[in-house]
Amino acid sequence: DAFKPRKGMLGTTFGGNHLGCVAALSVIQVMKDEKLIENANEVGSYFIQKLRSLGSPLIKEIRGKGLMIGIELSIPVSPIRERLLYEHHIFTGYSGTSVLRILPPLCISRKEVDHFIDALASCINGIESRPGQSRDFL
């Protein structure tokens, strides 16, 4: 059952190592024990539903699977990302100039999703309440 390494048995630089294998097995075990894949599917569906419920005209499309979510906007995402970071302490990614990328940890809860939705709504509402003005000031 146990793997017994001996001198000369491993001979590649990039072939892996015992510590790396043990770390990977531990991660897989935690993912199973904490049901992280199930959480990603369930909370991911909830996340997308909450995003769609925002109903903002600035949101062109919401796409994703599990917790890998993209929100395509009709404006550049940089002002929203800056406000999320500096006002709400939430870091987001981006793709191109108009897609906000959301990649939270697999253990995220519905409560944390609700916190993000409230923060995003605040940022979007701040932009929508200034029609006709340059958005560079955000």
Description of each model-found segment:
Residues 1-138:
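Conserved N-terminal phosphate-binding loop of PLP-dependent enzymes in the Aspartate aminotransferase
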